[in-house]
Amino acid sequence: MKQFEIVTQPIETEQYRDFTINERQGAVVVFTGHVREWTKGIRTQHLEYEAYIPMAEKKLAQIGKEIEEKWPGTITTIVHRIGPLQISDIAVLIAVSSPHRKAAYAANEYAIERIKEIVPIWKKEIWEDGAEWQGHQKGTYNEAKKGKAR
């Protein structure tokens, strides 16, 4: 188990969260992204994720370093699952701790946006009537676009 990794087995939230806990941290924000059944009115049967693992893990660690630079004192753990995932399975876990909650919340949101922008992970959405590969890389994180639908 590593602080930044790609896995094929179900993600155990508490084990990864514990990477971020120490006596200096007053807040831990944990985000788990799950496979949802409905997307834009289309029913999903399951998802299949693929990644270029060596590069993906390097990019996850890069995001952790970026967070540490933007919010000093934070500790980040990021784990993404690949392979077939069923409805409600955890696809991604991001845990960020900091001395105070505001930085932990902001850094956690930053992490998920950066994953979508720079980490070489692709998902295949399998629906009742077809399937389609989706890429996540969207370019450089832009604080001004935060909160806008993609």
From Swiss-Prot:
Name used for this protein in its record: Molybdopterin synthase catalytic subunit
Q: How does it assemble?
A: Heterotetramer of 2 MoaD subunits and 2 MoaE subunits. Also stable as homodimer. The enzyme changes between these two forms during catalysis.
Gene behind the chain: moaE
Give all cystine bridges in this chain: none
Report the EC code(s) recorded for this entry. 2.8.1.12
**Any one biological process term the GO annotation gives:** Mo-molybdopterin cofactor biosynthetic process
Report which reactions are catalysed by this protein: 2 [molybdopterin-synthase sulfur-carrier protein]-C-terminal-Gly-aminoethanethioate + cyclic pyranopterin phosphate + H2O = molybdopterin + 2 [molybdopterin-synthase sulfur-carrier protein]-C-terminal Gly-Gly + 2 H(+)
Species of provenance: Staphylococcus epidermidis (strain ATCC 35984 / DSM 28319 / BCRC 17069 / CCUG 31568 / BM 3577 / RP62A)
Residues at which substrate binds = 34-36, 44, 100-101, 116, 123-125
* Associated pathway: Cofactor biosynthesis; molybdopterin biosynthesis
**Domain of life here?**
Bacteria
CDD domains per UniProt: MoaE (cd00756)
Q: What does this protein do?
A: Converts molybdopterin precursor Z into molybdopterin. This requires the incorporation of two sulfur atoms into precursor Z to generate a dithiolene group. The sulfur is provided by MoaD.
